[in-house]
């Protein structure tokens, strides 16, 4: 099967955690080309991803380098994608992000705010801009921004999200940008934001401990990844511009 007949999925941040889990699920499907961005191709977690069980017919993994704080990496990654003969993207998942600061709102400083904003909001925006020409050639293209309920302005008080002002504020900015993409590109692309659940990653476990949920977050990486893929599979034009909890499929207030 030619590349033009394959479903091409781009996932940022596949080096570990949810991104790696999502990549493995798409790679298990026939005729899926999975393009994953990583910061460092030499890490053990990336080696594990590359050593995943042999993909079915017509499926393969392509890794590209993107550092979330770089203003040039996304465009360079697109050139690397084109060099492999790939001329379209059907699904783009802006998953890469970080929670580098856990300083409360009473103490958070400018450096923490700017670092989070650059990684979690500007990075996905630059990725969207770089991938746009390839998305326009996709079949019923979809864009999903991996956000968090901590970025929901409507849930700041119920979730006590003010314990993560830099992270939550940056994700709120990502939500605004996602809504902007959904509105401006609604004629041809379905765009959503999604909350992947409180997942058993380093940041997820920290939050679980902070709010008294125990040592580990309630959602495994595998279950989160499966929920994200299921949600994206079921998207329709009517889904455009919405913010979903991937775990249960419900809408999250912006």
Swiss-Prot record:
Gene3D superfamilies: NAD(P)-binding Rossmann-like Domain. The active site is at 167 (proton donor), 171 (lowers pka of active site tyr). Pfam families: adh_short. InterPro entries: Fungal_SecMetab_SDRs, NAD(P)-bd_dom_sf, SDR_fam. Coiled coil: none annotated. It comes from the Eukaryota. Belongs to the short-chain dehydrogenases/reductases (SDR) family. This is Short-chain dehydrogenase srdF. Transmembrane segments: none annotated. Its EC number is 1.1.1.-. Short-chain dehydrogenase; part of the gene cluster that mediates the biosynthesis of sordarial, a salicylic aldehyde structurally related to the phytotoxin pyriculol. The most interesting aspect of this pathway is formation of an aromatic product from the highly reducing polyketide synthase srdA. SrdA synthesizes a reduced polyketide chain from one molecule of acetyl-CoA and five molecules of malonyl-CoA. The polyketide chain is then reductively released as an aldehyde. NADP(+) binds at residues 18, 37, 67, 95, 167, 171, 199, 201. It is an enzyme of class 1 (oxidoreductase). GO terms for cellular component: cytoplasm. One of its GO terms (molecular function) is oxidoreductase activity. Keywords: NADP, Oxidoreductase. Induction: Expression is up-regulated during sexual development. Expression is also up-regulated during confrontation with the arthropod fungivore Drosophila melanogaster.
